[in-house]
Swiss-Prot record:
This is Transcription factor hepR. GO terms for molecular function: zinc ion binding. Keywords: Metal-binding, Nucleus, Transcription, Transcription regulation, Zinc, Zinc-finger. It is found in: Nucleus. A zinc finger (C2H2-type) spans 175-205. GO terms for cellular component: nucleus. The gene is hepR. It comes from Aspergillus oryzae (strain ATCC 42149 / RIB 40) (Yellow koji mold).
Length: 235
């Protein structure tokens, strides 16, 4: 019996399709697949932004906006709807479930201990890791790299268009303080937001000497809307 078994042909492991499988994918089907193409070298196999590539809807980033791929002199476009999906994606179903309907942030190195019960809350937190909107005033420290000169890639941007619009309003404040000074002249302080102006009135003018109007300029009724370049939808 033993001689018959020894006569059997040996298992050709080189030609076996099973031997060519990735060991990691066999051990755990939930791990992200690794692109075996030549373009996928060792430098970006486990890059911190690889997990971005297949988030739904508004979290999809085009390759030219991926911070891991933007050079110091690359011009960042203002809009991000020219998404060019890459082959590696992360699905919401891959998130770690830590309780009944609760998931934690999947971003590598995120120190948040929050647990999210819905996709909307998770997306709102997740995109805070990627400040992909930059100030469009050329000499602002929070402007992205552009034609006016490179800025370090670590410069802080903004997670939403609304946050950027609120910041840009500081470059061109149009809300004037409505109070009068002791000489009866209009206060010259200008603000980009109504709440800041009202706080100034309360602290400095003690809510007195109003000039009869609370706002000034075209931006007063909607101070959080981007009035400098375009009216953008609230995010």
């Amino acid at each position: 019996m033993a001689e018959t078994w020894m006569a059997l042909p040996l298992f050709n492991r080189q030609n076996s399709p099973e031997s060519s499988r990735d060991v990691l994918s066999m051990a755990s089907p939930g791990l992200l697949p690794i692109d075996p193409s030549p373009e996928h070298d060792e430098t970006n196999k486990f890059g911190p932004f690889d997990l971005l590539d297949n988030l739904p809807g508004e979290l999809q980033l085009p390759a030219d906006l991926n911070p891991a791929r933007v050079g110091p002199t690359t011009h960042l476009p203002d809009l991000t709807d020219r998404a060019d999906p890459e082959p590696r994606w992360m699905q919401i179903s891959d998130l770690e479930v830590v309780g009944p309907g609760a998931v934690t942030c999947p971003f590598p190195g995120c120190k948040s201990t929050l647990r999210f019960t819905g996709s909307r809350e998770l997306r709102r937190h997740y995109k805070q890791h990627f400040k992909r909107f930059f100030c469009r005033y050329p000499h602002c420290p929070q402007a992205g790299p552009g034609l006016q000169g490179p800025h370090p890639s670590t410069k802080r941007g903004f997670a939403t268009r609304k946050d950027r619009a609120r910041h840009e309003a500081k470059h061109d404040p149009r809300i004037q303080c409505p109070c009068l000074d002791e000489r009866g002249e209009r206060c010259s302080r200008m603000f980009s937001r109504l709440d800041n102006m009202r706080d100034h009135v309360r602290r400095i003018h003690n809510n007195s000497h109003y000039a009869g109007q609370e706002t000034h300029g075209t931006a007063d009724a909607i101070p959080d809307i981007d009035i400098h370049h375009e009216i953008e939808a609230r995010s």
